[in-house]
Amino acid sequence: GMDRSNISFIRNSQDENAAILYSLENGTWRADRDYQNDAFVLHGGGGMKSTLGDMLKYAVMYLNEGVAGNGNRIVERYAVQEMEKPRQFMKPGIYYGYGLETKQVGDRAVYEHGGSLPGVSSNFSFCPQEEVGIVVLCNTMDVSVAAIADAALNAYCGLEVEEERQIHAERSWSAEELEELAGSYVSGEGDAFTLTVENGTLSMKVNGNPTALQAVYPWQGMVRKTYSDIYLTAIRDEEGHVFAARYGSRIFPKEV
């Protein structure tokens, strides 16, 4: 079984065999085993702590459509298939299922889930067609573990390790987009960003930090990171008014 996996906070903080977590706070790096730091955001999803060995067992279960490596069925095949179905748009080419993101790598279907907290960056993915699972666990915050996982999968599949980045035609925000999108947005986890109109375009700050936002499609912008892109997509009501925005994998309600 997955003997080193649990949903505790204090247990891991007291475990000398648990990873030391490295996080950047107010410009200073800290190193500790504070597994409760900002951990309240995980309560809805269980807050699983695990190891590489246990997560590989987890990957085997998905690759076997619900059957563990020892032959025991953990969940029904139907349940795994329902988790993998694309249901909610996240960004171009990537959708959420139930607890899993789904995307294409070439003509291959890939399913994954990532996570981050102070001192933690993680990504879990698997590709049934290639019969491979990839787990990247890092005890440092804000590491591009998804890009590492994608590069590893590409290498395994014999593809170019570094994916070609999407190039968008130059586009300007319309007057309606500028008016509707401008404002402050706060997620339920405490992250926030602001959009202000400056010189005929939108200026963005994420948690107070200036962030370059490019208009790419109607009601959609993109932030180009070093190894990946984050899309911002307006969420509008039936009258066309923006009441929230999807940024990355989170929905940020717009403050009134």
Regions found by a protein language model. Give the residues of each.
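Extended, alpha-helix-rich binding/interface surfaces that flank or overlap catalytic cores
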Residues: 143
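Short acidic (Asp/Glu) and glycine-rich catalytic loops that position anionic groups and cofactors
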Residues: 36-38, 128-132, 161-162
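Short, well-ordered beta-strand elements
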Residues: 123-140, 242-246
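Peripheral terminal and inter-domain segments
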Residues: 108, 146-256
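Structural motif
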Residues: 105, 127-129, 198
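Short, surface-exposed loop or secondary-structure junction motifs
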Residues: 1-118, 122
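A structural signal for short hydrophobic beta-strand segments in well-ordered beta-sheet cores
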Residues: 22, 100-102, 124-126, 194-195, ...
